[in-house]
């Protein structure tokens, strides 16, 4: 049995872009209701075709078909095969296989043999845990049905890992088909029988009490569903379950969005960290290549004792690496590191820096001990900061607590205004270059970007006493410069961020045609022309500007 068609496979689109191997019924509420209404009028239910002819689009479910052994997922009906149909890459000279009717129960009465094969193919393709893709591959079963059937028929089988086939061994195909028909007759319910409240399906109450007017228009009445003459009650339940899933999907996709609390944070765990919440796995685990150690290892009867012991040692090493991977994942989940820390977000910039520096000790402490350590360290920082503020206030002449608090508040406000001005002027080097290029930080000698509290309390004559030697290494943007550019910045005393901004402005203006020679660039910057010349020469060296 070949694998069924999926719309996402490019190979199928090459063979026949306009046709799909499996006919899928849309899960929209309108289509789901229409499918139930059609089943009511016809007197029986129609299942989506598992296989279709690639040429005439005939439903081949339960019929003999011819499968090409060369082309991927290419099937033909008997009529098209008999006349030698050729389509795209498929030729009538290709080898083929005759695929017989497998619409009979093999393991359980509610699963046909072809559905069993599709289930195993899907698990082999998508792996365990991707049950939504597995259900889409099978086509005629829901995700819950696939999980339940695999667990009961395979995982809990007395013949594990094989299913229990004791009731089908030795029986012919006709006998299996007859058994399937008998099981269908036994599950049949009398026509026009009213279901009692206890026998009503769980979704009936939801269908009855649906408050939405649009959904009520498409929901068929329960009496109509219960009074339909069908072969069995199980297929009827599947249709209603599909309708419920359709309504849930519709509510999620096109319904009203649920209001979210202003303070509620929804971290994009999968996007940011590559973590799958449902499978509880990372896309890239710690020591992700650990399996390569024993990927090609094989135990043979001809192995000597030394070789066997060596392979066992490899297995022990691999086991330890798996234990370390598990320990790290449990550490991340236990400490809730995938989500933003509300306590960290409530801290100031300096306190947040201390918080991050203490994270390295988390591996040596329990969660409660580490949290207590961080609180104590931050409290110590706050106390020291308060002592420094009070000492500075006393030096300024404050004698009471209220005067000191007023002085500290004004100081904080002034620092905030200065930092705001620095951020506003950061993008325009020409506006502040003439005033701030007197120190390696791009600020006046009596101003520091982190405030006076981050500097030692020394007398003014001793501040920046070692600025005779200019070195831009370690400054912001220095890692983006070459050695030649760093040397030029040291010689001209230009900050790396200012140099990069000047390069950007000069490059854009040269491309616009505003700067055609070196002297045209002087008007764009409020710095010495010699510094502009050096930056312009660097552009000429890179082949951007004109040397004139």
UniProtKB/Swiss-Prot annotation:
Residues annotated as domain SANT: 106-158
Gene Ontology BP, a term: regulation of transcription by RNA polymerase II
Chain residues that bind Zn(2+) 2: 68, 71, 90, 94
PTM notes: Acetylated in vitro by GCN5, but acetylation is not essential for biological activity.
Keywords of this entry: Acetylation, Coiled coil, DNA-binding, Metal-binding, Nucleus, Transcription, Transcription regulation, Zinc, Zinc-finger
Domain SWIRM span(s) in chain numbering: 461-548
Subcellular location: Nucleus
GO molecular function: DNA binding; transcription coactivator activity; zinc ion binding
Tissue: Expressed in roots and leaves.
Record's protein name: Transcriptional adapter ADA2a
Organism: Arabidopsis thaliana
């Amino acid at each position: 049995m070949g694998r069924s068609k999926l719309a996402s496979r490019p190979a199928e689109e090459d063979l026949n872009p306009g046709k799909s191997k499996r006919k899928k019924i849309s899960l929209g509420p309108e289509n789901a209701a229409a499918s139930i209404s059609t089943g009511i009028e016809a007197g029986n239910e129609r299942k989506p075709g598992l296989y279709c002819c690639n040429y005439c689009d005939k439903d081949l479910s339960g019929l003999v078909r011819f499968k090409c052994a060369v082309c991927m997922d290419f099937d033909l009906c008997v009529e098209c095969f008999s006349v030698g149909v050729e389509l795209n890459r498929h030729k009538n000279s290709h080898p083929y296989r005759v695929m017989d009717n497998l619409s009979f129960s093999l393991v359980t009465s509610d699963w046909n043999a072809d559905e069993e094969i599709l289930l195993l193919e899907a698990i082999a393709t998508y792996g365990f845990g991707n049950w939504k893709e597995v259900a889409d591959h099978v086509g005629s079963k829901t995700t819950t049905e696939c999980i339940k059937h695999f667990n009961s028929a395979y995982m809990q089988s007395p013949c594990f890992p094989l299913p229990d086939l004791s009731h089908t061994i030795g029986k012919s195909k006709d006998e299996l088909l007859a058994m399937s028909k008998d099981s269908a007759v036994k599950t049949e319910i009398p026509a026009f029988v009213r279901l009692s409240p206890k026998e009503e399906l769980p979704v009936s109450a939801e269908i009855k009490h649906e408050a939405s007017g649009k959904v009520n228009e498409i929901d068929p009445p329960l009496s109509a569903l219960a009074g339909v003459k069908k072969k069995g009650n199980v297929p009827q339940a599947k249709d209603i379950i599909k309708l419920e899933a359709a309504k849930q999907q519709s509510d999620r996709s096109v319904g009203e969005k649920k209001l979210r609390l202003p303070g509620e944070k929804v971290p994009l765990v999968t996007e940011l960290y590559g973590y799958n919440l449902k499978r509880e796995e990372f896309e890239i685990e710690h020591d992700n290549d650990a399996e390569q150690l024993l990927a090609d290892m094989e135990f043979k009867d001809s192995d000597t004792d030394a070789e066997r012991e060596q392979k066992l040692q490899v297995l022990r090493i691999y086991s330890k690496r798996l234990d370390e991977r598990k320990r790290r994942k449990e550490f991340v989940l236990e400490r809730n590191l995938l989500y933003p820390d509300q306590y960290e977000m409530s801290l100031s910039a300096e306190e947040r820096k201390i918080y991050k520096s203490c994270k390295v000790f988390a591996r040596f402490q329990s969660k409660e001990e580490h949290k207590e350590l961080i609180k104590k360290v931050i409290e110590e920082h706050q106390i020291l900061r308060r002592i420094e503020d009070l000492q500075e206030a006393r030096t300024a002449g404050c004698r009471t607590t209220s005067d000191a608090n007023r002085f500290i508040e004004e100081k904080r406000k002034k620092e905030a205004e200065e930092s705001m001005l620095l951020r506003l002027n950061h993008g325009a080097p020409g506006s502040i270059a003439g005033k701030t290029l007197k120190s390696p930080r791009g600020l006046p000698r009596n101003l520091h970007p982190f405030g006076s509290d981050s500097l030692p309390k020394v007398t003014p004559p001793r501040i920046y006493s070692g600025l005779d030697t200019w070195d831009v290494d370690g400054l912001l943007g220095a890692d983006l410069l070459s050695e030649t550019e760093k040397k030029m910045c040291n010689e001209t005393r230009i900050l790396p961020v200012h140099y990069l901004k000047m390069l950007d402005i000069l490059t854009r203006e040269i491309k616009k045609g505003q700067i055609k020679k070196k002297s045209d660039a002087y008007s764009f910057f409020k710095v010495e022309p010699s510094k502009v010349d050096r930056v312009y020469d660097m552009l000429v060296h890179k082949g951007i500007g004109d040397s004139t």
